[in-house]
Amino acid sequence: MTEKLQPLRGMKDLLPDDYKVHDYIINKARDVGVLYGYKQMSTPLVEYTKVFNRSMGESSDVISKEIYSFLDKSNDFVALRPEFTACIIRSLISNRLQHKLPLKFFSTGPVFRYDRPQAGRQRQFHQLNYEYIGAKGAITDADTLKLAVDILKALEIEQDTTLELNSLGCNESRSVYQQKLVEYLNDFKDQLSEESKIRLSKNPMRILDSKSETDQKIIANAPVLSEYYTDESKEYFEELIQYLDILGMKYSINPRLVRGLDYYCHTAFEFTTKKLGSQSTILAGGRYDGLAKIMGNNDDVPAIGFAAGIERIALMREYNISEVKPVFVLPIGKNNICYALEIVDKLRTENIAIIIESLGKIAKRMQRIFNENAQFIIFIGDEEQANNNLKIKDLKKAEEYIVDFAKALELLKK
């Protein structure tokens, strides 16, 4: 018996109804981005693995556990992109766009992570991604956060999310804090989860993200980053808060919200929801001024960005999306098909969506049309062809018309 082929675990087909929702989300988000000056770009699905090793760190969960990396036929290690930011910065450097800064980029498409599949978390999923490159300062961060809020509003889910906000401070702040955090955690080293024991030597701030209940109890009394802010870091965060208050934005300061990579600084944020269980993060981002230099640029480039999961957004609410309903043309006999094709072609040039139903018996064709919930059917038989007319049936009004092409056009465009 022939094996029944299935998609890979954690990867799903996007059927027309799914794609309709995805397109709606993407178009809404793109339209808001345009109002903020963002321009769309795309990068390859496949990059050299070292692009992500540099950007995310070899000890990160994504690189150590989740990345799809393999040796290609040229003996190069390549990877399916697990996120967009590294790809965008790689593109900035390889296309020598530094002289055009500042730049605002919007991207969308699939990303891949070898994770345990569950609702809202698949191994292939789709993201909206925004990067504001070459602009520094709290005003830039406030503008980026307002963009995120406006996107969620356009998608009618902002009211079901909470903006969690923190400042990672400057390099000096984080360096002092990390030292104090390690000193604190060393006293509990034997009680930490196995994963956190590994992180303690490689990336201690990531322990603050631990899902282990034991780790969380230890973390509850750990030093807080804000206690070690320099004057510069305090002023930056206070300025950001001032701008958010002026914009009337609601937020919750979460002192445990961190990023474990050295190139992140100052603003970090997440929009979370209670509607999706454990997959509570809808949109997340932060400032990453140090990434470009790590990836080979001569200098640091200030940048801030965020990504949002399309599948998770789609789970947040039901979207009633109106569609263009096609007009169906039904030639009665085989000798009517040529005339029907002429009519179909003329109507499409007038931007009317048309489907020609010519296969099978009339009853079966009519059933297929009814299943599509169509409004108009154009019948073309010998009489219509001889008189150069069209018989149009309006299924919603239960009315029938026999008209010439000009009148038919007028009727169908109402």
From Swiss-Prot:
It is found in: Cytoplasm. It holds the Pfam family HGTP_anticodon. It catalyses: tRNA(His) + L-histidine + ATP = L-histidyl-tRNA(His) + AMP + diphosphate + H(+). Its EC number is 6.1.1.21. Its main location: cytoplasm. GO terms for molecular function: ATP binding; histidine-tRNA ligase activity. The keyword Nucleotide-binding applies. One of its GO terms (cellular component) is cytoplasm. SUPFAM superfamilies: Class II aaRS ABD-related, Class II aaRS and biotin synthetases. Belongs to the class-II aminoacyl-tRNA synthetase family. Homodimer. This is Histidine--tRNA ligase. The lineage of its organism: Bacteria, Pseudomonadati, Pseudomonadota, Alphaproteobacteria, Rickettsiales.
